[in-house]
Amino acid sequence: MITSRLFLLTLTVLSCVPTQARPVIATVYHEWYEGRPDYCGGIYRDNKVSAAHPWLPCGTQVNVEYKGRSLVVPITDRCECDSIDLSYRAAKILGVPVDGIARVHIHY
């Protein structure tokens, strides 16, 4: 009983801690992926806001910041390394170069 109360108290305290901005490298999906299945069971579309991450669970809402712009994107796929791959639309909204890479900050 005490253990479960301590566990719930710990969860409550941790859920009140603000997330920290974490710098990562952002890349943009290549147009080749258009219409292909993603890891989370959907179909990748260039015109949808989405992202891939190496270990965050499917459906996690991630706030991505780049040069003063901010956008919440759902994780719908997996990618390699410790980075984030943005859909074409997400990159355009944020101003991330669609033919290169950029350092962004993510909150999750």
Tell me what each language-model feature is.
Residues 16-108:
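Secreted/periplasmic proteins
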Residues 5-15:
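Bacterial N-terminal signal peptides
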